[in-house]
């Protein structure tokens, strides 16, 4: 495609210079640029394609950064980046080395007000900006998807909006989707509460008629979209009850109508809810047909067939830890006919789709409501029913009190399947799963473990149902280096606090958590080149530690290395030092983990080099710390 307009847009001021008639052409160029770039890098595709016209219209009518846009989940900000001076090589490398972040990032641009990686916070942040702002001429525009209304934080903020708040426009991008289809009463209610029951029934009849049209009519989805807009315009909306002036619904793919509507409401003296209807994946036929699979894509997605990220995918090599976990839960579901699985909007990412399909009555997606997911799971456990709450490490932070008060304090046997434990690499600082141990380890009654491979993962899941205590099974989103057995029994259950010696040596004791055991075994081989023999231990459990085994090993090992892909604060290293202190054991300990800094996005090799967790870096740090010889200066490898 020839780009006639986009190369000349270096700021919103350049956009303002265009005539209204040229905006549709610009939108086409932006949409093509996103598809072209993400076909090389991967990234969040469908949500950005659906928001092209809306974002262009917002920047055309308002003046960023004086007017402030706050995106609810910054992964829908690619168009915003292109319009604010970031249509550079860095955009072509988005989420990779030397590329832009996949989220809004103030360090990148003063047009990004907040770093936004988690959902549901935009309205609260925007209200805070409005409360503290001294610039009465500035507009504040939180931009929310309809899925954000399943998040309690959004509703709390909605409850606090002053009726006399001016120049405050809530933009509701209603595509009836989260990552997957919306769940729960509230997102569905945004549509159903908009118009009376009679109109709702009429809508169902019309949509049914459209679906029965011949398949060669490819515009069925567009026709359905226009019907939705027309019917919603007949109704009195829910949001008026919250003191908001409702405007909409507006066709989110008609940039001229969007501009005209925004110009009309720009200076109204009360808070406004601007309701826009869009189609997720708009402009790319495959993404429109299957917005779930095209929500986030891998590089070269146009040259390969996208595979479903579900539990029982074809047994291809390698299979990731989450895929193994999904398979194991399906097998557990067959063995334990009462087992319930709960997730906060991560059914697809955590490979739970097969469990959902096989056991729909025993699967609950609560939407973007992590606290509710945890406490809901606690209620299930209290009834005597086994339950697994599957949740990303980075999202578990949001439910810390629920874990403490509703699970651990009640001594309820909720199994937490903590996905994405470890570095997130391309998603960057908001998504790294490297902090959860800091609060989980402090909670009484909590058992915490991490497998090094699929076989240990399998044993931990099956064993956890026997422990009868709260437990957390952590695992990363990387290939597991061994296949699970795919059998029920017999298997050897693991008791909390059972570690495993992987190899024995005389000079060093290297304790490595989870998948870092692979790195530890490589380091052991490197150290052999220097005549150093190493005992490598997989602790399996962070809490409780295998005290008996450790005490035995420490009688003839005084040099110890702890290796983990977690913050050096509050993880395995901290637990081990506490163990030494409690037992009055003296040892020289080198604790290696993620340094106390926010880790940026980038390719795995780059990030591991940055933080010193490659096998070469680790070997050099061990040699330097224990003074086995004078190594290459460590500053060349690592800066904390």
From Swiss-Prot:
The keyword Transferase applies. Mg(2+) binds at residues 146, 175. It catalyses: D-glyceraldehyde 3-phosphate + pyruvate + H(+) = 1-deoxy-D-xylulose 5-phosphate + CO2. It holds the Pfam family DXP_synthase_N. One of its GO terms (cellular component) is cytosol. Its cofactor is Mg(2+); thiamine diphosphate. GO terms for biological process: 1-deoxy-D-xylulose 5-phosphate biosynthetic process; isopentenyl diphosphate biosynthetic process, methylerythritol 4-phosphate pathway; terpenoid biosynthetic process; thiamine biosynthetic process. Its EC number is 2.2.1.7. Thiamine diphosphate binds at residues 75, 117-119, 147-148, 175, 370. It is an enzyme of class 2 (transferase). Disulfide bonds: none annotated. Pathway: Metabolic intermediate biosynthesis; 1-deoxy-D-xylulose 5-phosphate biosynthesis; 1-deoxy-D-xylulose 5-phosphate from D-glyceraldehyde 3-phosphate and pyruvate: step 1/1. Binds 1 Mg(2+) ion per subunit. Binds 1 thiamine pyrophosphate per subunit. Belongs to the transketolase family. DXPS subfamily. Homodimer. HAMAP family: DXP_synth (MF_00315). Catalyzes the acyloin condensation reaction between C atoms 2 and 3 of pyruvate and glyceraldehyde 3-phosphate to yield 1-deoxy-D-xylulose-5-phosphate (DXP). This is 1-deoxy-D-xylulose-5-phosphate synthase. It comes from Chlamydia trachomatis serovar A (strain ATCC VR-571B / DSM 19440 / HAR-13).
């Amino acid at each position: 495609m020839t780009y006639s307009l986009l190369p000349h847009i270096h700021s919103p001021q350049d956009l303002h210079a265009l005539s209204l008639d040229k905006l549709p052409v610009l939108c086409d160029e932006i949409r093509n640029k996103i598809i072209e770039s993400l076909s090389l890098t991967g990234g969040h595709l469908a949500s950005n394609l659906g928001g092209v016209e809306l974002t262009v219209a917002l920047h055309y009518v308002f003046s960023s950064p004086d007017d402030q846009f706050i995106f609810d989940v910054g992964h829908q900000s690619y168009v915003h980046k292109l319009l604010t001076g970031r249509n550079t090589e860095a955009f072509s490398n988005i989420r990779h080395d030397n590329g832009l972040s996949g989220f809004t990032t103030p360090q990148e641009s003063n047009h990004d007000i907040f770093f936004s990686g988690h959902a549901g916070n935009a309205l609260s942040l925007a209200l805070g900006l409005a409360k503290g702002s001294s610039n009465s001429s500035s507009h504040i525009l939180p931009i929310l998807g309809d899925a954000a209304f399943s998040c309690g934080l959004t509703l709390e903020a909605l409850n606090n909006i002053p009726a006399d708040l001016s120049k405050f426009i809530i933009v509701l991008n209603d595509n009836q989707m989260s990552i997957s289809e919306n769940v729960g009463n509230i997102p569905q209610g945004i549509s159903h509460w908009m118009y009376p029951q009679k109109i709702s029934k009429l809508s169902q009849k019309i949509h049914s008629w459209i679906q029965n049209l011949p398949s060669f009519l490819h515009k069925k989805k567009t026709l359905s979209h226009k019907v939705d807009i027309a019917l919603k315009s007949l109704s009195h909306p829910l949001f008026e009850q919250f003191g908001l002036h409702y405007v909409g619904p507006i066709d989110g793919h008609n940039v001229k109508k969007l501009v005209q509507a925004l110009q009309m409401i720009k200076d109204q003296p009360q808070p406004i809810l601007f309701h826009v209807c869009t189609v997720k994946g708009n402009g790319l036929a495959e993404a429109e047909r299957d917005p779930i699979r095209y929500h986030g894509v891998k590089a070269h997605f146009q040259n390969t067939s996208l595979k479903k990220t579900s539990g029982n995918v074809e047994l291809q090599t390698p299979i990731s830890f989450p895929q193994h976990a999904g398979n194991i839960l399906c097998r557990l579901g067959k063995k334990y006919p009462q087992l319930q699985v709960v997730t906060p909007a991560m059914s697809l990412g955590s490979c739970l789709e097969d469990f959902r399909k096989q056991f729909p009555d025993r699967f609950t997606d609560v939407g973007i409501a992590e606290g509710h997911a945890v406490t809901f799971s606690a209620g299930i456990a209290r009834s005597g029913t086994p339950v697994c709450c599957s949740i990303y490490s980075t999202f578990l932070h949001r439910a810390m009190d629920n874990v403490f008060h509703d699970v651990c304090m009640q001594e309820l046997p909720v199994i937490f399947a903590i996905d994405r434990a470890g570095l997130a690499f391309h998603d960057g600082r908001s998504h790294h799963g490297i902090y959860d141990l800091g609060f989980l380890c402090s909670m009484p009654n909590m058992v915490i473990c991490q497998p090094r491979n699929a076989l240990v993962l399998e044993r931990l899941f099956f064993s956890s149902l026997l422990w009868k205590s709260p437990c957390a099974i952590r695992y990363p989103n990387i290939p597991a280096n061994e296949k699970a057995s795919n059998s029920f029994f017999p298997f050897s259950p693991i008791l909390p606090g059972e570690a495993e010696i992987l190899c024995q040596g005389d000079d060093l004791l290297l304790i490595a958590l989870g998948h870092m055991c692979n790195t530890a075994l490589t380091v052991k081989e490197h150290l052999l080149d220097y005549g150093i023999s190493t005992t490598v231990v997989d602790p399996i459990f962070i809490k409780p530690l295998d005290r008996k085994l450790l005490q035995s090993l420490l009688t003839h090992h005084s040099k110890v290395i702890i290796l983990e892909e977690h913050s050096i604060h509050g993880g395995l290293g901290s637990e081990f030092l506490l163990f030494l202190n409690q037992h009055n054991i003296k040892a020289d300990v080198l604790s290696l983990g993620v340094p106390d800094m926010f880790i940026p996005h980038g390719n795995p090799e780059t990030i591991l080099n940055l933080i010193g967790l490659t096998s070469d870096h680790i070997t050099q740090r061990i040699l330097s710390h224990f003074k086995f010889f004078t190594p290459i200066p460590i500053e060349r490898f690592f800066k904390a």
